[in-house]
């Protein structure tokens, strides 16, 4: 595993046309930014039709989206970022309800992420989550929930490395029968740990 000093610095970048080819290449290699369903083929088709519109739709606020069970629900405010180290590392997103730390029942957590297979086991997910927690504080959240599959030990370690504490095991029928873990990260307790990125 490369040391943190030798590894290129991770950035969270807003999706844009300049790095879209790297994103499309990852999709073409079978990676999906969605952990619940494989959207790689659908997104590749959208990029092929109109790359600019694809980026616009990714970043569009408001509107609705369809859950895996077909239910149409309002889209929450969100921040979508691509993890980048000179190459595409993966996807990470933050969603929230203004004025509250609570989430609707159909939203599994505030933050979701997916690292491309060839960049895993390098600490990128841990660092990406740390950077996104800074964004969560900036939008006023005092605590965030993150969920993961019970068998996803790597994801559990990523969350726990960012001070996540296990709250419960649960099943979300809309998203399948698998048992999931719900973690909570208290951001207020981390306020004294503000980094240079957060102060800038």
Predicted features along the sequence, with ranges:
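Conserved acetyl-CoA-binding loop-helix of GNAT-fold acetyltransferases
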Residues: 112-115, 121-138, 156-161
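Short, well-ordered turn and helix-capping elements at secondary-structure junctions
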Residues: 96-98, 150, 170
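Short alpha-helical
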Residues: 18, 153-154
